[in-house]
Amino acid sequence: MCIRTAKNVDVSAILEVAHATPWEKDEYLRRQIGLGHVEILCEGDSVVAFIAWNAEFFSKPFVWLVVVRPDRREQGIAGRLFAAVEARCAGLRLYSSTNRSNVAMHRLFVRRGYRRAGELELDPGDSEAFYCIDL
């Protein structure tokens, strides 16, 4: 397995992984790939997972999407992708968020040393919890 920055040639494979979950942001993701803000985890020629981030959150780095193929979840892959983004953001404060209902992501944030930064009621009944870490 390897983790590397996604390139435009990876778009189709990344969108295939993305569409394993409800998805409607293809163009935004394409733009982030072009800017070098998407890291992918590959096995051979196959994209297993990706993480997308940018500095559009109050000019701070923010991980806005992590997707792991359903058959590869709960194997530490998301943590490896977070480590790759954290390395790129060394010396900064990195933010991310997840819905209250996403227990696996809350556990990942705690394991990686993130602290709770706040909460917004974006989805009725399933608020968004924000986390951050100083790198």
Per-region residue spans from a language model:
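Conserved acetyl-CoA-binding loop-helix of GNAT-fold acetyltransferases
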Residues: 68, 74-87, 107, 111
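Conserved GNAT acetyl-CoA-binding A-motif
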Residues: 88-100
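Acetyl-CoA-dependent GNAT
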Residues: 5-64, 69, 82, 122
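Conserved N-terminal entry element of GNAT/NAT acetyltransferase domains
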Residues: 1-9, 133-135
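A short, internal acetyl-CoA/4′-phosphopantetheine-binding micro-motif in the GNAT/acyltransferase core
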Residues: 65-73, 98-100
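Conserved active-site alpha-helix within GNAT-family acetyltransferase domains
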Residues: 79, 100-119, 126
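Short hydrophobic/aromatic beta-strand or adjacent loop that forms the aromatic wall/cage
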Residues: 36, 126-131
